[in-house]
Structure formats: C-alpha cells, structure tokens
Amino acid sequence: MAGGGPRSRAELLTDVILTMFRANNATLAWGDRIVAPLGLTSARWQILGAIVQADRAQPVAWLARDLGANRQNVQRIVNDLEKDGLVSFEPNPHHKRAQLIVLTPKGQETYDAAIGLYGPRVEALAQDLTVEDLDATHRVLTALRTELETSAAD
C-alpha cells in the first residue's frame, strides 16, 4: 500500500490467494516430476488417491465432488486410467449409467509406488517447516476452502 499504512484484510488475502495459485502450480509440477517414472501425472495420481481414500467404490460424479473438480475432467482422467489398466468400471446397483470406479491390482501397485516415491520427498520438503506453521497453514486454507465453497453455493 502506498504510504506504508496498514494493509487491509482484502489486500492481505489477495496476496495469499496469488501465493496459493503459484504454490498450486509448483505443487502440481513437483508431483508430476515425482510420479512421471510411473507413467502418472499429478492429476492421475490425485484421482487414484481419491479412489484409495474412499470408503467404498464411487461413481465419477462423487469422486469429482470430493475433489472439488469438474466431473468431465475427472471422467476423462478415469477413462485414461481405465485404458492403462489402473482402474475398472463396475455396475452400480443404484444407477445404471453411473458406473462405480474400482482400483485394479495394477492401480493399487502404481499408487503404492507413487506413495513410496513421495514419502522421502515430502519429508525433505517439510524439514524446514515447523509443526505450528503447518497446523496454522492447514487451518487457514481449510477456512478459506469452506468459505469459498459456501459462498459458491449462494
């Protein structure tokens, strides 16, 4: 701010949002480098992770909702994963057209390998960050996400 006066919350939040955009891009590129040897991208890895984390098989629309992603983009990635033998489609007893997405044994092996590559790298990345800073960052990002999702529903 010109004059060196105190910055408003909106100005500070704008800086946070711009930093989040840059951090997101850097994180995706970092993830791409980690999983490239496995034939994955960050986007494919994220979908595999959502499938692993789900308590049961889900249709694409549910995965997209859980990820906060566009259903069509998730469908395209799931189709690619299916072509590569990492996921399969199963009938959904509750909906004829919305098939359930299931990880194949090859998909589980690939996901496990990705986590194996990720572990040492995330440990190294976290090395100079305090637990308190990470907790505070998580709280702020969670609050922002909640507010954005709530305001998007209005």
Describe the role of every protein-language-model region.
Residues 1-38:
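N-terminal leader segment of winged-helix/HTH proteins
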Residues 1-8, 131-154:
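C-terminal regulatory/oligomerization modules of transcriptional regulators
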Residues 15, 46, 135:
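Active-site phosphate/pyrophosphate-handling residues
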Residues 25, 29-70:
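N-terminal helix-turn-helix DNA-binding core of bacterial DNA-binding proteins
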